[in-house]
């Protein structure tokens, strides 16, 4: 199949998903002789309108994995406002060095339901968003070598297709999708209400620049507070 465009589409709060998805899309675009394009939906305003593709598009679509699944706050946007219209897609998941569980297969399923035809998929380790030690420095050079290998193999597969595949790409995970992973303490007990944790801040060090509020993916920071 001939592709006119290869897209890097991603949510990447800490930059690791962006690093993987953009690198993969750039290589695939070069191999396919196609235009390279990007769309980042990090901010709420980026998720307000529809995002539509077509048969001439190959979309490398990436999200992080939270608690073993696609982040639940992103699902309404991906499910309701992203339209494949027959485009090819590659779901990509970044996880913080525990396990991607059903994050990749869930993303694949949602993209298929959106009208994409998935042709490959990949999950990669990225430094954990809560810690500088979990998956520190990942994706590293070895990870990126695998990203590049997947990009080349994906482009080669697309070149060999006569038409869009009817069967979704095989990826690891359980279907039906399992519940979100429950974190546990050192004694194996479930940690309750961990989502209600609040960061400890030092207001004396705040210079009131407003950068944190402008960049917050969920618009959860009040710039006046």
Where are these regions (language model features)?
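FMN-binding flavodoxin-like domain, especially the glycine-rich phosphate-binding loop
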Residues: 1-44, 49-188
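Iron-sulfur cluster-binding cysteine motifs and their immediate structural context
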Residues: 201-202, 207-225
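Extended, small-residue-rich solenoid/repeat segments and analogous flexible loops
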Residues: 179-200, 205
């Amino acid at each position: 199949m001939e592709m006119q465009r290869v897209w890097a589409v991603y949510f990447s709060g800490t930059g690791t998903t962006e690093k993987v998805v953009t690198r993969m899309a750039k290589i695939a675009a070069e191999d396919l002789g196609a235009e390279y394009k990007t769309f980042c939906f990090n901010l709420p305003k980026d998720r307000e309108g529809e995002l539509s593709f077509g048969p001439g598009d190959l979309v490398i679509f990436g999200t992080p994995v939270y608690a073993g699944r696609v982040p639940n706050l992103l699902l309404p946007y991906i499910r309701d406002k992203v339209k494949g219209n027959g485009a090819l897609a590659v779901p990509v998941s970044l996880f913080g060095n525990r396990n991607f569980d059903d994050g990749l297969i869930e993303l694949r399923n949602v993209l298929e339901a959106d009208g994409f035809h998935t042709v490959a998929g990949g999950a990669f380790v990225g430094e954990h968003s809560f810690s500088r030690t979990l998956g520190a420095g990942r994706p590293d050079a070895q990870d990126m070598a695998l990203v590049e290998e997947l990009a080349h193999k994906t482009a080669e597969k697309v070149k060999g297709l006569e038409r869009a595949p009817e069967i979704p790409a095989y990826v690891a995970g359980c279907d039906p999708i399992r519940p979100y992973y429950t974190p546990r303490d050192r004694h194996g007990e479930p940690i309750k209400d961990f989502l209600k944790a609040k960061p400890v801040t030092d207001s004396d060090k705040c210079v009131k620049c407003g950068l944190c509020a402008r960049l917050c993916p969920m618009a959860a920071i009040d710039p006046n507070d």
